[in-house]
Structure formats: structure tokens, C-alpha cells
Design a protein with these regions (language model features):
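Secreted, luminal/periplasmic, and some membrane-associated catalytic domains
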Residues: 32, 43-189
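Active-site His/acidic residue clusters
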Residues: 2-41, 47, 78-79
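Surface-exposed acidic, glycine-flexible loop patches that form ligand/cofactor-binding
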Residues: 1-8, 53-57, 171-174, 202, ...
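Structural motif
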Residues: 12-16, 64, 182, 212
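Substrate-binding rim/cap in mid-to-C-terminal beta-strand-loop elements of soluble/periplasmic
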Residues: 15, 91-132, 198-240, 254-256
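Short, His- and charge-rich active-site/binding loops that engage polyanionic ligands
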Residues: 181, 189-191, 196-200
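Soluble non-cytosolic domains of exported or imported proteins
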Residues: 7, 32-39, 43, 128-133, ...
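Extracytoplasmic/secreted cell-surface and envelope-processing proteins
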Residues: 23-26, 72-76, 130, 191-194, ...
Length: 256
């Protein structure tokens, strides 16, 4: 329909294989359901690749496979391996949230703090003293939620940190739009309270993703150097000899 590869101009086709995300959320990465999904996906991709190479010839197509995030193993699976892991009880969380908000209201009045999911926002009308009181109460109470590692302000996250975790936390903060208070979970813990799993933490299991460049007459090689997902676009631009803005986050890397 789109006549891909029919002329001298390169064509770029994006495919979102999103079922893998849903299956992983519901059943975990090591589940039989995910295994079945991967086996079927592998076959579908193989059929697709073969059909395209039959039309255009081998070596004329470059395939790039990656992911937008990793995932946490099921906490139950990790616990069986002797790893401290768990789910945040929604009932316990909501109870502590309720107690905390009542304490804050008793100190500074109503309509000053807003909660969205597990994040807390301060009303712009709050003065410095009110912010200090609210922050102290939030830190004192929310740390009692089992599985919470720390309760921090966005300004604390923006402080320089040399380790990967601090850098990742800092990168997720927008000074004007981000929550004022963050709850950082312990490693291997999740807000998913009943079943399945999730992602979104700064830990390696959530941030480490696969990246495969295949085809295009490239030599097979496994690399262990540090590459970021934002490096994919400028790398592809370099391969296609396309100009790209130099002030973007990503940097091209060599494919040998």
C-alpha cells in the first residue's frame, strides 16, 4: 500500500508492539503468558522480515528493536529468591495518606495540599512557613508506609548527585510542573497492590532496555558500553545522512 523501498528515498516504518507491555503488566516478565507472547511475536516478526526481504533483498533493510522501559519482576517471584520485595498495600497507603492530610489541615487549613495518585502538590498561595510545616508532616508520616524508602521534595531531587539513581531522579523533575513531594520506593517494591507488576522507578531493572540494530550488512557484535534510548534517533539520522539539531539530548554512536 505504501510502496516502501520502491525508490531511492529511504522509508522509515515504526511498529509499536504494545501487547508485550500489557502482558508483562498483568502477568510478569517470566510468566508463561509472556513466554507465549514472545514466541508468537518472534514468529510474526520473522514472517514480516522475510516478506520484506523477499521484496527488497537482504541487506537493504535496517531493523532497530528496542523498548521504552524495563520492568520489575513479580514481587512474589523475587521473594522466593530471598530478595526483599513487596507490594504497597492500598489500604495502608490510603489510611496513612488520610491521617497525613488531616494533620496538615489542622496546622495550615484546608485547600493547601493536593494529592494526585502518590504525589503531593502545594498550592501556589502557600507561604514559606506553611510549606515548611506541610513538608515536615509529609516526611514524618509518609515514611511509615511499608516499602517507601524516602520522602523528598523536588528541590532535594534537583541537587547534584554523582550516582545513576540520583541522576535519573533529577532528570524527571520539571521545576514548574512536577509534584512538590515525591515518595521514592525501596528497590524491588511496587505500588501495584494486588497482581501483576509495573515500572517507573529509577532502578536498573526499570531503566535497562534492549537495543538491537540488525540488517543493513552490519557485522554482528555485542556491545556493553553505555548507550541511551535518546541516542537512537541521531544515530539513525547519521546513518541516513540527515541533519539533526545539535542541542538534543541524544548523541549518535558508531555501529561497527
Amino acid at each position: 500500500e505504501y510502496e516502501l523501498g520502491k525508490d531511492d528515498s529511504p522509508d522509515i516504518l515504526f511498529l509499536g508492539l504494545s501487547a508485550t507491555d500489557g502482558v508483562g503488566h498483568d502477568n510478569g516478565p517470566h510468566s508463561f503468558e509472556q513466554l507465549d507472547n514472545h514466541l508468537r511475536l518472534d514468529k510474526y516478526l520473522g514472517d514480516f522480515i522475510n516478506s520484506q526481504e523477499d521484496k527488497l533483498g537482504k541487506g537493504n533493510i535496517l531493523y532497530i528493536l528496542s523498548s521504552d522501559h524495563g520492568v520489575l519482576d513479580l514481587p512474589e517471584y523475587l521473594s522466593e529468591q530471598g530478595i526483599d520485595s513487596g507490594r504497597i498495600s492500598r489500604a495502608v497507603r490510603d489510611s496513612i495518606f488520610s491521617i497525613t492530610m488531616k494533620k496538615i489541615r489542622s496546622q495550615i487549613g484546608n485547600g493547601k495540599i493536593y494529592r494526585y495518585e502518590n504525589f503531593f502538590y502545594f498550592d501556589h498561595s502557600m507561604n514559606g512557613a506553611e510549606r515548611k510545616v506541610a513538608t515536615e508532616i509529609l516526611k514524618e508520616e509518609l515514611i511509615n508506609i511499608p516499602g517507601v524508602d524516602s520522602v523528598v521534595t523536588k528541590y532535594e531531587l534537583l541537587k547534584d548527585g554523582n550516582d545513576n539513581i540520583s541522576r535519573r531522579l533529577k532528570n524527571m523533575v520539571h521545576i514548574n510542573k512536577s509534584p512538590d513531594i515525591y515518595l521514592i520506593l525501596k528497590k524491588y517494591w511496587t505500588w501495584t497492590s494486588k497482581r501483576g507488576t509495573s515500572h517507573g522507578s529509577p532502578y536498573d531493572y526499570d531503566t535497562h532496555i534492549p537495543l538491537i540494530f540488525s540488517g543493513g550488512n552490519k557485522i554482528s557484535k555485542i556491545r556493553s558500553d553505555y548507550i541511551r534510548s535518546v541516542d537512537i534517533a541521531p544515530t539513525l539520522a547519521r546513518i541516513l545522512e540527515i541533519n539533526y539539531p545539535k542541542d538534543i539530548d541524544g548523541k549518535p554512536f558508531l555501529i561497527k
